């Protein structure tokens, strides 16, 4: 684990809300073939976040998103809400400092 690992979004609340963070999320449920990636891109772009979203072979969706901690928290809440397409049963997450690796938010195939 990186020495800069923060934990979950709940743990990140103890940090500066303006600090840029990276959220890695694995979304479980009925999240493939329901437009989940498309809506995830739209939500990330609406919030001016960067990162990627991709379908995994096990039926989950992997999301990596970077931006200000308070905005990433809003995005994380959306990921697990009824507003997200399909049916989200569980979101596994980890948070670390942002790397600045991304310049946009894209679907990875």
Swiss-Prot record:
The answer on whether this UniProt entry bears the keyword S-adenosyl-L-methionine reads: no
Sequence intervals crossing the membrane: none
Q: Could you tell me the keywords of this UniProt record?
A: Hydrolase
| Record-level Gene Ontology MF annotations | acylphosphatase activity
> What Enzyme Commission number(s) does the record list for this chain?
3.6.1.7
UniProt catalytic activity: an acyl phosphate + H2O = a carboxylate + phosphate + H(+)
Keyword Coiled coil (UniProt): no
As given in the record, the signal peptide range reads none
Which Pfam families is this protein grouped with? Acylphosphatase
PANTHER family, alphabetized: ACYLPHOSPHATASE
Name listed for the protein in its UniProt record: Acylphosphatase
Q: Which organism is it from?
A: Arthrobacter sp. (strain FB24)
State which gene encodes it.
acyP
